[in-house]
UniProtKB/Swiss-Prot annotation:
Subcellular location per the Swiss-Prot or TrEMBL entry: Cytoplasm
Protein name, as recorded: Elongation factor P
A GO-annotated cellular component: cytoplasm
Keywords from the UniProt entry: Cytoplasm, Elongation factor, Protein biosynthesis
InterPro entries tied to this protein: Elong-fact-P_C, NA-bd_OB-fold, Rib_uL2_dom2, Transl_elong_fac_P/YeiP, Transl_elong_KOW-like, Transl_elong_P/YeiP_cen, Transl_elong_P/YeiP_CS, Transl_elongation_fac_P
Family annotation (SUPFAM superfamilies): Nucleic acid-binding proteins (SSF50249), Translation proteins SH3-like domain (SSF50104)
Amino acid sequence: MPKINGNEIRPGNVLEHNDGLWAAVKVDHVKPGKGGAFAQVEMRNLRNGSKLNERFRSADKVERVRLEQKDQQFLYEDAGMLVVMDTETYEQVQLPAELLGERRPFLQDGMTIVVEFYEEEALNATLPQKVVCKIVETEAVVKGQTAAKSFKPALLENGVKVMVPPFVGQDENIVVNTETMEYSERA
């Protein structure tokens, strides 16, 4: 693993620090009038999700870790574990459902997700940015309500509530952004 200087840390870098794997979330490079320059780094632990603020001087060396990204096809869920298949080797692997966090309801059968591995350990999973969902319940449009830009709540088939424009009705398919968990467009 390559070592990098403290001033080379960028957001998104994965670092091995204090016997753990940390993702740099926010990096501020500071050059005070007195003393040496340093990087103030906000980090998130990839194994337990805890946060840490750390200061690295320019001369400090830190291990930068490269995660292996693999496309995996979701097959089914079994007792809180997601069973996925590697799209290249067709090998089946079980992953904890917690890897997806609050985006778990958007996972659909046959969907391809990107899983990040470090030494055969799955640390993170990412859904496609846009997913098609069906609206099962929403309010009817009230005449004259569309004078200003307005939204109404809608319940999706996966149990998630999103705000949609008034022209979208029940039993319609919409595209939802899985990163922001917001309505994107009609499908």
